[in-house]
Amino acid sequence: MRRLWSVIAATLLVAVACQAPRSTASTTAPAAASSSAAPNFAGRTLNIVTGGTGGVYIIYGAGLADVLSKKLKVAASAQSTPASVDNMKLIRDGKADLAFTLADTAFDAINGKGRFAPPEAKVDAKTIAVMYSNYMHIVAKAGSGINTVADLKGKRVSIGAAGSGTETKGIRVLEAYGLDATKDIQPQRLNAQDSADALRDGKVDAFFFDGGLPTSAVSDLANSTAIKLIDQSDAIAKMNAKYGNFYFAAKIPKGTYKNDVDVVTAGVANLLVVPSSFDGALVKAILQTMFDSQADLALIHPEAKNLKLDTATQGSPIDFHPAAIEFYKSKGVWKQ
């Protein structure tokens, strides 16, 4: 735990400097001394946009920034954000180099749908890896009488931070159960940690958070408060029918958060994306470093154990960066 927080602190210290618009130097290829010279990325800056406190993105992103800084000699930092929706906007606006994002949010961003419908501008971005799966956590206090999504009607519910993928997906889950987030609940928009704190303190009745396993805010809450995780199995087909085939049944295993049974949630893939113009040589170097350092990343967060060559190309609804395709072809895993 001490190593984890030291990594996060070190990478976040320089993140503020990366919030200004990125220069083209960060995404265009450096001049080579000769055609045979190996790319040298020393001194290049990389701003990795992640998520909020208590979630997986910020932890994983901080670990990735640490690894890339050490192995590629770049100046990589992890910037805390509301998460997916804002991350795609930061890519679009030239303020980020790599972004963690949900697959459904990425699709909307590229195609000008949902939160990216006009007058919002589309995002020109490409996937470089499918990282791991997200699980929609819907959390209430045990014994509260909230046992189904329908029971949230009229309740105080945090549906995720404004600008997060949790917010978008949470609204869709509610909709699948016939609930309008603007009318049928008392919505609040808090990040994972603030949501967990608010539930513990009786300020909300339930909260949504879409994250990997384990999500630290939920783990910490479960250690002090008896919680109930809400099943969403009936939502998945309805969400896919309306929004696209992004969602799948994802089980939170028994015991993850002291839960007595497996809980079926609406799952979605997490992507690592870059601007379409991103330097191809650097894409390949980042991917090689990520896979070479998978064991180190897994020490930062267990979800990094799911970073695998044979699954990193599966489940992205947006195109892969050409250099990423070349990388995966060189490893014999590109099947598309």
Annotate the PLM regions.
Residues 1-44:
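Short, low-complexity disordered leader/linker segments with a strong preference
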Residues 43, 55, 73, 83-86, ...:
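Extracytoplasmic
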Residues 43, 187, 194, 200-202, ...:
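An extracytoplasmic/periplasmic, membrane-proximal ligand-sensing/linker region
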Residues 43-76, 133-201, 295, 310, ...:
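Bilobed "Venus flytrap"/periplasmic-binding protein-like clamshell domains
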Residues 60-66, 77-119, 193-198, 213-222:
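Pocket-flanking alpha-helical
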Residues 100-117, 171, 175-178, 206-247:
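A ligand-binding cleft/hinge motif common to bilobed small-molecule-binding domains
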Residues 118-131, 136, 254-264:
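A structural signal for short loop-to-beta-strand junctions that line the ligand-binding cleft
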Residues 132-146, 265-281:
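A bilobed periplasmic-binding-protein/Venus flytrap-type ligand-binding module shared by bacterial periplasmic
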